[in-house]
Amino acid sequence: MNTDDTKIERQLTVLLRKSVRIHLSTQRGDVSLERSAYGIMCQLADEGPQRLGALAAAFGLDPSTITRQVRDLENAGFASRQTDPSDRRASVLDLTPCGRQVLEQSREHRRFKLQEALSNWSSRDLSDFGRLLQEFNTSMDRLAAFGLLLCTNGFVFG
């Protein structure tokens, strides 16, 4: 690993740690979301209703793990299953109105924290950072597509 790789790895570790702190700060008040619940809820909000197998594949998790996490969302009233219109033998998971509201509150809190952190950045720096972060995520997706990443409990390991 060269010096740049070492710096990047360190900064990613710091970023993960700080993102956990931001996540934990959203757990104040009446509703708290586990990291896994937040991820599943974002996937459903952004991509629409999905079968559990598709959710498991999206996160690189075993279907039994997703099933447990989904059960928690259903028990909390944040998600519900309906019959899949394309195959009546299967079901799809979607957010409930309550789940959408809770997710939006959590996302709003996260956006506020990001705005605070980035308030002194120039427009150009923000644009560059967004572009580079998108490129990084695309590169990580390519690795995952080749099975070079293992996702466990919401964390990615190479």
Outline where the language-model segments fall.
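N-terminal leader segment of winged-helix/HTH proteins
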Residues: 1-36
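Terminal interaction helix/tail motif
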Residues: 8-11, 15, 108-158
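Short amphipathic alpha-helical/adjacent loop interface patches that line ligand
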Residues: 12, 19, 37, 59, ...
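N-terminal helix-turn-helix DNA-binding core of bacterial DNA-binding proteins
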Residues: 22-65, 70, 75-78, 92
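Charged, amphipathic alpha-helical coiled-coil/dimerization segments
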Residues: 74-131
